[in-house]
Amino acid sequence: LNANLSTRYEAPAVKAFNFAEKSGMLYYITAGDKAEEKPGLYLLNTETGVKTLIKEGDGVFKQVTFDEDGANLAFLYCAQKDSCYKAMSLWLSQQGAPATEVAARGNRAFPKGWVISEHGKLQFSKSASRLFFGTSPEPRQKDTLQLAENRPNVQVWSWDEPVQYTVQDYNKEKELKRSYQAVYHINGGRICQLADEELSQILLGDEGDAPLALLSTSRPYSLSSMWEGRTRSDYYTVS
């Protein structure tokens, strides 16, 4: 409802919606109806009443994200629910225009065998010139054709592993969802993989607009930290 325009907006079968932080832009995802509205992701300017179908589809939308002013909208999309773990693609809408795909599985910037992660956080830099997203090695899937009682349940751990078994077990679910930072440079249309399995931790400066990012890893010191009682790290910069 826009009181200034005395206008009421309605949409059928809405699954999710949200507003931009500093504007009247609203997105919503709908299953649609047979009469008027197609299924997909819509953008509504509540100040002017203009509605745009950003991406048509009844697949899976995730991480739908505005920039601060609502001029850009990014999201992950997969046409098939069962393929989200390996077939997510990154889409971007600028200035209210229909979205275009900017990254997908097999992109040359990704390490071989890596995909866009459905668990990675999607975010714009402060200036909205960069779009950060997550990638990961393609997750392994369980063999659903084999009965659980026929699967061996053996856990092997060596005393000199860098991470203790109890810690591995505690962090298992977190590790399965781990993603690694990548960035899409909106103005140049260029993608860069910033973090990877060797340098997994990243710190962005100036709200994502800094010319350098700080990468770190504590992996070389994981074993010694067991008796030292503290964790050391190596630090690197990436531009």
Name each region found by the language model.
Residues 1-239:
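Beta-propeller folds
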